[in-house]
Curated annotation (Swiss-Prot):
The lineage of its organism: Bacteria, Bacillati, Cyanobacteriota, Cyanophyceae, Gloeobacterales. It is found in: Cytoplasm. It comes from Gloeobacter violaceus (strain ATCC 29082 / PCC 7421). Belongs to the class-III pyridoxal-phosphate-dependent aminotransferase family. HemL subfamily. Its cofactor is pyridoxal 5'-phosphate. The gene is hemL. This is Glutamate-1-semialdehyde 2,1-aminomutase.
Amino acid sequence: MVTSAFQTAQSHRLFAEAQQLMPGGVNSPVRAFKSVGSEPVFIERAEGAYLWDVDGNRYIEYINTWGPSIVGHSHPEVISALREALPKGTSYGAPTRLENQMARTVIDAIPAVEMVRFVNSGTEATMSALRLARAFTGREKIIKFEGCYHGHADMLLVQAGSGVATLGLPDSPGVPKSTTAATLTAPYNDLAAVEALFKQYPSDVAGLILEPVVGNAGCLVPEIGFLEGLRDLTHAHGTVLIFDEVMTGFRLSYGGAQARYGIEPDLTCLGKIIGGGLPVGAYAGRREIMQMVAPAGPMYQAGTLSGNPLAMTAGIKTLEILQRPGTYERLEGLSARLADGLLAAAREAGHAATGNRVGAMFTLFFTEGPVRNFADAKRSDLQKFARFHRGMLERGVYLAPSQFEAGFMSLAHTEEDIDYTVAAARTVLAAL
């Protein structure tokens, strides 16, 4: 926590310098704090559930490196494994025993997975999975959902229209309309909209991709029957069902969202946690589909650093820790304590607020509920969220600098951390 007056002079200086060196001063847009009308604090180190910035401020953090740090930052067992691995080399560009071990671990954890291909990021995973779906089906169209972010590949940078379901338009300059013309969109949790798309294109859809629990519009939870309905529709139309579990994989349960909800997709995209904090991604699924990937099949995909030995080392150790008894019960309990406490604090202070949570993912929305899709989430009071974010930061609590990003719990958090956070929130919310 902040032990003296909140100072950010060094962060301010570094951000001014960074803006002359990198676009916007950052290497991923959300880090710039633009959506909360502020400047970022520059981090010096991380340990457990805490971050320290260059000005000496300590924070309880609920970003977990945007998901990967579920066992806590600098976990001693992960660090020890990496120290042992480093002298053996940082990259080989050749097969390793570690890749076999990591692949087997993923296959054993997720019932729908029979084969795995490792890549370097979530974007690579989703991009490759959609290419594979098209190769397997011989079709071109894909369906995605409004508010679901699947990385920055051109075909996925699509803004949904206001109708029941519309053809996508480019969501970023530089993306040709022709690239997104085959991308169809529907509101999350709207099964009727998906049915309408399949009625319009009954034999044209190669793949349907979604975050089973959305994290990039804030935390959006699937309603009863939604995922089941998607599984039935994709089966009926010969469409590949793809779960983007880059965020939810190994977080909502050891087998991910699909194990928690009992729905088996055809392909699964992974990342974040499976690298233990190092860059990694993977796409995985049924053997008959994965056998299409080169060199076993004709669908080409490659990567210089794919299966990097350090990422495999950190991922193997992280998943080993997550398999221990009581892990997910602890995450569930801590997350419920925080989410319930924040919502109660907001309502006690008279604010319109809604809390969404599944497992170790949560969001406090500054709007009346329910929040079941991206349109609902966009009704949130963003100015109020920005003031709340700043007030919490000044009190030593580091939240995601966007209303539309889920928060994350780690095994390193304590009940004392949660109680401090809720108490800080009460103070901030009372003054908004």
